[in-house]
């Protein structure tokens, strides 16, 4: 089996959420077996709301992104977590 890059969009609870603090919390809960690829990027959505885009390298086995999705969803200040792209590397 190989590895895949998974692009994950994390929506904060509100425009008032401190994205710098949220980025640090996200980095702190990346599960074993997943590695952060590059920086966590801010993506403008609308009306001042920005999503965080996280790219992780994970094993391509079934459910490879689930531990990360579950960990990110439990972080205080996170409204929603969605895998937007997965590709083999």
From Swiss-Prot:
Gene Ontology molecular function: translation elongation factor activity
Keyword check for Disulfide bond: no
UniProt entry tagged with the keyword Transmembrane: no
Keyword entries, A-Z: Elongation factor, Protein biosynthesis
Protein function: Promotes the exchange of GDP for GTP in EF-1-alpha/GDP, thus allowing the regeneration of EF-1-alpha/GTP that could then be used to form the ternary complex EF-1-alpha/GTP/AAtRNA.
HAMAP family: EF1_beta
UniProt record similarity statement: Belongs to the EF-1-beta/EF-1-delta family.
Protein name (Swiss-Prot/TrEMBL): Elongation factor 1-beta
Gene designation per UniProt: ef1b
């Amino acid at each position: 089996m190989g590895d895949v890059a998974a692009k994950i969009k994390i929506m904060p609870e509100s425009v008032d959420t401190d994205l710098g603090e949220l980025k640090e919390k996200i980095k702190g809960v990346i599960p074993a077996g997943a590695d952060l690829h590059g920086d966590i990027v801010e993506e403008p959505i609308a009306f001042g709301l920005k999503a965080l885009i996280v790219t992780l390298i994970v094993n391509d086995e079934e459910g490879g992104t689930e531990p990360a999705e579950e960990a990110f969803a439990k972080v205080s200040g996170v409204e929603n977590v969605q895998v937007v792209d997965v590709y083999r590397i």
